[in-house]
Amino acid sequence: AHMDVDTQNQFAVLQLRRELAQSNDLKIESDCLSYILNHEKKVLYFDKHRIVKSPGYEIYMEQIDEAIFYKKEDGYYVWFKKKNKTYDFELY
């Protein structure tokens, strides 16, 4: 069964929230989000229409036009544009 866009988004956001809930030392570095998980630095970033994680190249979302990670007050967020709609989710 093909997931609709909203379901795909929510699933990806849930995965990111779960990942970040176990992490610490979150920082925004030029629209990317870096954090420490199991003593290793990870970075979430936008690349070639995808939201991915390094090291490695784990893909969380695809077919995205634009995406940025940002901090607002005490929260960390992702903003992205997909099929001419924009979305904004709190991640941490």
Which residues are covered by each model-predicted region?
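Arginine residue identity/basic-tract feature
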Residues: 17-18, 50-53, 82
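Edge beta-strands of extracellular beta-sandwich domains
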Residues: 85-92
